[in-house]
Amino acid sequence: MALRFLGIDPNTGDQGSPTVWLDDETGDLVIQSYKADAATLAACAEVGSVPGHSTDVPEHETVVRLPGYMLQFFPKP
């Protein structure tokens, strides 16, 4: 895996911060951010996604909350 650092929360302290990397081999974004709280998880389940798709978060996945200003570090298509 060849990760390339794209950016970190500019307001970072020493407690960890939202960070974005790009996997140059797959084009995947790798994101470190805040764990979603129970209210966020409930809202995700309520809104849902595509018809016929479970609203439960599978064991091998998680939901994170990324501050909107971190989008500046996402690659442009």
What kind of region is each of these model predictions?
Residues L3, D28, V63:
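A residue-level signal for beta-strand positions that form part of recognition/binding surfaces
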Residues A42-P77:
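Helix-rich interaction surfaces within compact, conserved domain-sized segments
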Residues D14-D56:
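A short, structured beta-strand/loop element
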Residues G7-P10, D24, S33-K35, G68-M70:
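Generic secondary-structure microfeatures
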